């Protein structure tokens, strides 16, 4: 190994250490603010503990070892299919200024913050939540999602879904074909077939989760908007 290679490795190690320290510190502040809010239900505790485990402790999510994790970059990713195939969807929205700062040096300047944050998380590679994902599902809803899919494909298996923006038959037919392609990929990964029964159960579960999420969001009217640590 040359001296230049050693310097590069040392630089990458320092960058990862700074990223992990800053990201963890930021997560601690935000979680503390959330815990200090009044009126939050006790049922919120497991979610806060999970966030603390992943973003402060830098640990993997509590997913069984025999259940593959599938990263998703949009709410339009069909979680029902992922659950029905025996996998676990993980939302990777990349809302992190720390990751954005890293990605800002890796992608073109005109790229949007979402692209830069996504690249930052993947290039630093310190988050177990990202490393544990065996596949990424990226619904292409804008130009930045196209860029994200291209970047991720160099490091993970990526399935793109071109969500129709018009009600034309050709667009809908293409989207349906891509959904069937995603089903095949999921079944190959998990070794399980998506059946009517498994899909029905998954749809009921995600529907119930969406309903509970809407109830949770209603608490915003009662407790107000949480101030950011910087503004506090």
Each language-model region and where it sits:
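Charge-dense, low-complexity intrinsically disordered segments
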Residues: 105, 169, 173, 193, ...
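A structural signal for short, well-ordered beta-strand segments and their strand-loop junctions
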Residues: 71-72, 89-93, 137-138, 159-162, ...
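A charged, amphipathic alpha-helical module
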Residues: 2-68, 184-232
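An N-terminal, globular interaction/scaffold subdomain
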Residues: 52-53, 59-60, 67-126
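Acidic/His-rich segments in extracytoplasmic proteins that coordinate ligands and/or metal ions
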Residues: 121-188
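Short, well-ordered coil/turn elements that cap or connect secondary structure elements
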Residues: 65, 84, 153-155
């Amino acid at each position: 190994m040359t001296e230049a290679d050693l310097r590069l490795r040392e630089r990458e190690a320092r960058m990862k250490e700074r990223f992990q320290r800053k990201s963890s510190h930021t997560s601690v502040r935000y979680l503390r603010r959330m815990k200090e809010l009044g009126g939050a239900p006790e049922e919120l505790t497991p979610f806060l503990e999970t966030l603390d485990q992943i973003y402060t402790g830098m640990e993997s999510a509590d997913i069984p070892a025999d259940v593959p994790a599938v990263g998703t970059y949009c709410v339009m990713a069909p979680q029902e299919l992922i659950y029905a195939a025996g996998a676990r969807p993980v939302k990777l929205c990349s809302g992190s200024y720390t990751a954005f700062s890293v990605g800002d040096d890796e992608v073109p300047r005109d790229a949007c913050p979402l692209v830069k944050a996504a690249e930052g998380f993947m290039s630093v590679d310190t988050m177990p939540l990202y490393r544990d994902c065996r596949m990424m599902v990226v619904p292409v809803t804008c130009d930045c999602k196209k860029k994200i899919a291209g970047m991720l494909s160099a490091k993970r298996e990526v399935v793109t879904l071109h969500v129709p923006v018009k009600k034309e038959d050709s667009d809908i037919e293409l989207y349906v074909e891509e959904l069937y392609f995603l089903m095949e990929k999921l079944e190959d990964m998990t070794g399980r077939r998506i059946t009517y029964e498994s899909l029905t159960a998954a749809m009921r579960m995600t529907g119930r989760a969406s309903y509970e999420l809407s109830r949770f969001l209603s608490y915003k009217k009662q407790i107000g908007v949480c101030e950011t640590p910087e503004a506090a």
